[in-house]
Amino acid sequence: VFGRNRVGVRFAPLFTTTTEDRVYLGLVESNPHETYIRAAEMLNDLGIAYISIAEADWDNSPDLPETFRRDLRKTFEGAIIYAGRYTVEKALTVNSKGYGDLYAFGKPFIANPDLPYRILKGLSFNQVHNHTLYGGGEAGYIDYPFST
């Protein structure tokens, strides 16, 4: 129906420590770095458009190891998208090293309906109210203020 250049794959390589141990939903991988880099090689050979990396986003979660970001960029020629606890500063740092192409701001977008404008103008962000996320009501979704 559509070409490979319109297909992307999302990974959630939830490294639990910077020594790259991984435990997720009862699964344990002996070498998550090698596993995901090999998968990226295969996807690169197929010519897909992008890989999206969903990083762990809980408050004390570790960052992806820089060696993983570096090796993913060396391995995969398409676009790389990162998401999970991104700030403007973190996105700029990762981008300055050439590791990624696009950066997602999920929760900040919920709390800041004008997020692109705030980023452009260097304005502060509204704080996310975690207790209202995914609650089924309008509180926390349509009541965050726009910047003035």
Question: How should each PLM-predicted stretch be described?
Answer:
Residues V1-T148:
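Flavin-dependent oxidoreductase catalytic cores
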